[in-house]
């Protein structure tokens, strides 16, 4: 399960999506998230889903690689679906047994929550798969740069994001090594129910946390030895510039927004 996590990993390529300015991707991701949460009718979910599928095709990222990112949260998806079945009480009762009652509105909301989580994870994974952590950080820093006039720590926030994204694949690799070492000693992480499998993961957490703190300490010492003092006087090898592709992407997101709003109003 751990090796299936693709968040923070970069898939090398030279596709149209890879070449987009990271600021375009970040702003587009915000628009995409808003659109996904604006959808309140089942047929309208086809629009953001189709848009994500087109982006995956243009990015030339293997579909299996994107779908693999859903495996680690499959239990969360099932859990959220079941919880919403019993949390929503409005609507017409379709299933009633003892003290349990499930309404049509509860089923609809459960489906909506599940679809939103899937679409959001696919979109987020696609953004990290097609953007290097450094480019993503530079884009975020440039977007937040106007806030530095009111002493907002734009560079520090961007640096924290870079380190976090960079360490995700490292910690995944470290956890995989620890699991293999534990399995060589007879540990079993695959069999048993969900609670038993979660309990079996405890021996992995302690050495993983120790390794994470050790790596963080080594990184801090390396940054101090290189006289790192934040973003003051920092220059960049690659200066971010908007291109023709970014204009096309902005138009595509505008069309996506217009289609979604129109479908929401026209579809009963």
Region annotations inferred by a language model:
Residues 14, 37, 61-65, 97, ...:
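Membrane-helix interfacial "entry" motifs
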Residues 73-187, 194:
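Juxtamembrane/interface alpha-helical elements of multi-pass membrane proteins
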Residues 41, 45, 60-64, 88-96, ...:
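Transmembrane helix-loop junctions in multipass membrane proteins, especially transporters and channels
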Residues 69-77, 114, 118-121, 202, ...:
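Loop-to-transmembrane-helix entry motif
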Residues 1-44, 48-57, 142-152, 156-159, ...:
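Transmembrane alpha-helix interface motif
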Residues 25, 64-74, 249:
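Alpha-helical transmembrane segments and their helix-start/interface "positive-inside/aromatic belt" motifs
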Residues 51-61, 76-79:
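Alpha-helical transmembrane segments and their membrane-interface exit regions
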């Amino acid at each position: 399960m751990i090796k299936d996590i693709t968040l923070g990993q970069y898939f090398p390529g030279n596709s149209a999506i890879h070449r987009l300015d990271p600021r375009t991707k970040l702003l587009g991701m915000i628009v995409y998230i808003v659109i996904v949460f604006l959808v309140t009718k089942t047929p309208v979910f086809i629009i953001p889903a189709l848009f994500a599928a087109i982006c995956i095709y243009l990015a030339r990222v293997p579909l299996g690689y994107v779908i693999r990112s859903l495996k680690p949260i499959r239990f969360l998806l099932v859990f959220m679906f079941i919880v919403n079945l019993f949390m929503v009480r409005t609507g017409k009762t379709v299933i009633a047994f003892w003290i349990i009652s499930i309404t049509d509105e509860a089923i609809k909301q459960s489906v909506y929550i599940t679809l939103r989580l899937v679409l959001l994870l696919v979109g987020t994974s696609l953004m990290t798969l097609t953007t290097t952590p450094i480019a993503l950080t530079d884009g975020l820093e440039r977007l937040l740069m106007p806030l530095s006039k009111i002493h907002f720590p734009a560079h520090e926030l961007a640096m924290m994001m870079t380190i976090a994204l960079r360490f995700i694949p490292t910690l995944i690799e470290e956890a995989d090594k620890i699991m293999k070492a534990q399995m060589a000693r007879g540990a079993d992480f695959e069999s048993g129910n969900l609670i038993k499998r979660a309990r079996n993961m405890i021996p992995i957490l302690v050495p993983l946390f120790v390794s994470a703190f050790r790596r963080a300490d080594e990184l801090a010492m390396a940054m101090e030895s290189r006289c790192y003092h934040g973003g003051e006087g920092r220059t960049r090898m690659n200066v971010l510039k908007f291109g023709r592709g970014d204009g096309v992407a902005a138009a595509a997101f505008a069309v996506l927004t217009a289609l979604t709003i129109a479908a929401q109003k026209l579809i009963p």
